Amino acid sequence: MDVREAMKNQTHVAMILSGHVLSSAPKDSNVIFSPASINSAITMHAAGPGGDLVSGQILSFLRSSSIDELKTVFRELASVVYADRSATGGPKITAANGLWIDKSLPTDPKFKDLFENFFKAVYVPVDFRSEAEEVRKEVNSWVEHHTNNLIKDLLPDGSVTSLTNKIYANALSFKGAWKRPFEKYYTRDNDFYLVNGTSVSVPFMSSYENQYVRAYDGFKVLRLPYQRGSDDTNRKFSMYFYLPDKKDGLDDLLEKMASTPGFLDSHIPTYRDELEKFRIPKFKIEFGFSVTSVLDRLGLRSMSMYHKACVEIDEEGAEAAAATADGDCGCSLDFVEPPKKIDFVADHPFLFLIREEKTGTVLFVGQIFDPSGPCSGSNSDSDDY
């Protein structure tokens, strides 16, 4: 098994999923979600009790040849990407998994061993028939604890009933400091232009240091590396900003990103440029939704899933968290050219993502239409968004 190729397939799936999630979101809304968190929940579903009933759909969706391959990818993520090395200066990462399963279901003891020892998950027998609401609150409390209190009320009222058999949950949080932090002294209010033709005044961070920026046909890419720990020899994290040249060009850029295999690896700024102007807005957003209909359109039917994520960007770095609950109911080689001065002023809608560079894992993806918008863009109670 080629682990590198398997990881590349997961990156491709993440971008396809991103295209569907972002394009299906309410028009002109700020969105943040975690493909990695959703992937983990789906992988546990495929490997867990009764997973054989949906494993064919899941393997097709994840472009994987077998459950063993999915488990190999999961192991790679757990040991490399999700290892918490904050004690040595790297990002603080927490990844937690859980399975709440109805006591009435006949299960092989091997599944308990699989979840506790391989997935490092909590395995909790519960009584959905008479205590559905109590279980919902328990899962929400677990998620809140494992996301540093950032994700609250993942499962909305009514999402867990007496007909629920299992809930697979994944919680993921990330907090990283920029390799080169921004000076708060240079933060100034400037106009951010909305797609309706108006503008809002928001705080923009700025720096006079050279930045990893590159211009492509119709858009620019900024890469902001995170500080690495002294023992982070086999991984590195960066946040990417994808800024269309046109103020209303986000939809076209999203379509290109989601439909072009290898898009991320072929659009990586590899050297630092001196910029004429450099500004990116501070922002804090939260977004929650039912993933069910998105997965249905992608071939994963009869899978009920809720997801919520949040991210905050400031002068020191980024803090992000995500949680997914799946309820079962009945580097490219760039040509290096001489540096030339360009601008990177993110004063209109853009895409962003947080990625581990060596495995290619996409932890978080989002879009900003209005950085002054309220923190919560959540709409988990609807069937779709």
Curated annotation (Swiss-Prot):
Signal peptide start-end: none
GO cellular component: cytosol; extracellular space
GO molecular function terms attached to this record: serine-type endopeptidase inhibitor activity
Induction: By beta-amino-butyric acid (BABA) and infection by Pseudomonas pathogen.
Source domain of life: Eukaryota
Record GO biological process: DNA damage response; DNA repair
InterPro entries tied to this protein: Serpin_CS, Serpin_dom, Serpin_fam, Serpin_sf, Serpin_sf_1, Serpin_sf_2
Pfam families assigned: Serpin
SMART domains: SERPIN
Sorted UniProt keywords: Protease inhibitor, Serine protease inhibitor
Residues with site note (Reactive bond): C331, S332
Region (RCL): 317-341
Disulfide feature: none
Domain remark in the UniProt entry: The reactive center loop (RCL) extends out from the body of the protein and directs binding to the target protease. The protease cleaves the serpin at the reactive site within the RCL, establishing a covalent linkage between the carboxyl group of the serpin reactive site and the serine hydroxyl of the protease. The resulting inactive serpin-protease complex is highly stable.
Protein role: Probable serine protease inhibitor.
Protein family (similarity comment): Belongs to the serpin family.
PANTHER family: SERINE PROTEASE INHIBITOR, SERPIN, SERPIN-Z1
Protein name: Serpin-Z1
Naturally occurring in which organism (per UniProt): Arabidopsis thaliana
